[in-house]
C-alpha cells in the first residue's frame, strides 16, 4: 500500500532531521496565526471556500506541473483563494518545507502544511515554517497517536485538518475531537474515487465541525452538489495545476467570474 511506503520513508527522513535539529528551538519562535476557521467556514456571502494547493507531483499521477514555480503559483492563489495547501513531502510529491517558508513571507491567507505527520517534530517544523494548520491522516496512525499529535498541534496554536476516508476513520475523528474534518474521496489503497463519501458521513458529525472535501473536485457543479451535502471548503490541487489561468480556475470553482 502506497501509504505504508510513504510513512516508512517519512520515518527514515525524520530520524535524520531529528539528529541535527533542536525541537524546542522551533517552538521558541513567537509568531502570529492567520485565522483558519474563519477562512474555511462557509458563509452566505462566500459559500464555497477554496483551499488551493501548491502541488508538483503525486504517486498516482506522476509530475502534474512541469514548469513548477511555487512562489509564483502562490502569488496567484492569494488573490482569489481562501487558504492554501503546500505539499512538503519530498519523495512522492516532490514538495519541500522551503516552499512553505517562502510563501509564508507574503501570504495573507492561512497555510496548510500538507504532509504525512507522524511525530511532534514535524508539527514543530510546521510551526516554525509559518503553517497555520497541519494535516493528520486517520488511516496513517492509531487513535491514541492521533489524539496525542492533535492535542500537541492545538497547544502550539496550530489548527488541524483531520483527513478521513471511511466510517472507521470518522470514529477516530470523533474520539480525537476533531473540529475540521476533511473527506478524501480518493481511496489511498486503490486510488478509486467515492464522491458520495461526504454525503454518507456528514450527518454523523457534530454541527460545529467544519467540513472540507478533498480530491476529484474539477467543476462548479461538483462544488454545488457537495455544498448541498454540507461541505464548507474544497481542497483542490491537481485541477488548478493543469490550468493555464490559475486565478480564473479558482474563481470558476467559487462560481465567480473575473
From Swiss-Prot:
Top-level EC class: lyase
Keywords assigned: Amino-acid biosynthesis, Aromatic amino acid biosynthesis, Decarboxylase, Lyase, Tryptophan biosynthesis
PROSITE patterns in the cross-refs: IGPS
GO biological process: L-tryptophan biosynthetic process
Pfam families hit by this protein: IGPS (PF00218)
Pathway the protein acts in: Amino-acid biosynthesis; L-tryptophan biosynthesis; L-tryptophan from chorismate: step 4/5
Source taxon at top rank: Bacteria
Disulfide cross-links: none
InterPro entries: Aldolase_TIM, Indole-3-glycerol_P_synth, Indole-3-glycerol_P_synth_dom, Indole-3-GlycerolPSynthase_CS, RibuloseP-bd_barrel
Catalysed reactions, as listed in the record: 1-(2-carboxyphenylamino)-1-deoxy-D-ribulose 5-phosphate + H(+) = (1S,2R)-1-C-(indol-3-yl)glycerol 3-phosphate + CO2 + H2O
GO MF assignments: indole-3-glycerol-phosphate synthase activity; phosphoribosylanthranilate isomerase activity
EC id: 4.1.1.48
Similarity comment text for this entry: Belongs to the TrpC family.
Protein name (record): Indole-3-glycerol phosphate synthase
Organism encoding this protein: Nautilia profundicola (strain ATCC BAA-1463 / DSM 18972 / AmH)
Amino acid at each position: 500500500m502506497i501509504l505504508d511506503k510513504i510513512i516508512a520513508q517519512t520515518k527514515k527522513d525524520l530520524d535524520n532531521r531529528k539528529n541535527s535539529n533542536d525541537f524546542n528551538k522551533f517552538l521558541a519562535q513567537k509568531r502570529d496565526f492567520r485565522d483558519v476557521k474563519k477562512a474555511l467556514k462557509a458563509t452566505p456571502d462566500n459559500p464555497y471556500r477554496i483551499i488551493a494547493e501548491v502541488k508538483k507531483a503525486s504517486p498516482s499521477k506522476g509530475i502534474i506541473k512541469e514548469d513548477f514555480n511555487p512562489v509564483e503559483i502562490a502569488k496567484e492563489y492569494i488573490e482569489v483563494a481562501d487558504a492554501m495547501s503546500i505539499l512538503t513531502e519530498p519523495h512522492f510529491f516532490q514538495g519541500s518545507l522551503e516552499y512553505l517558508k517562502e510563501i509564508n513571507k507574503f501570504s495573507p491567507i492561512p497555510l496548510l502544511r500538507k504532509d504525512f505527520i507522524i511525530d511532534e517534530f514535524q508539527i514543530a517544523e510546521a510551526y516554525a515554517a509559518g503553517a497555520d494548520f497541519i494535516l493528520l491522516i486517520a488511516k496513517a496512525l492509531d487513535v491514541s497517536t492521533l489524539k496525542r499529535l492533535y492535542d500537541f498541534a492545538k497547544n502550539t496554536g496550530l489548527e488541524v485538518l483531520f483527513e478521513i476516508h471511511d466510517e472507521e476513520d470518522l470514529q477516530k475523528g470523533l474520539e480525537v475531537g476533531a473540529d475540521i474534518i476533511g473527506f478524501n474521496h480518493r481511496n489511498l489503497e486503490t486510488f478509486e474515487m467515492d464522491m458520495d463519501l461526504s454525503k454518507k458521513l456528514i450527518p454523523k458529525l457534530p454541527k460545529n465541525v467544519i467540513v472540507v472535501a478533498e480530491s476529484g473536485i474539477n467543476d462548479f457543479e461538483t462544488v454545488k452538489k457537495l455544498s448541498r451535502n454540507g461541505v464548507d471548503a474544497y481542497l483542490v490541487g491537481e485541477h488548478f495545476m493543469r490550468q493555464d489561468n490559475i486565478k480564473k480556475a479558482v474563481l470558476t470553482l467559487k462560481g465567480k467570474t473575473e
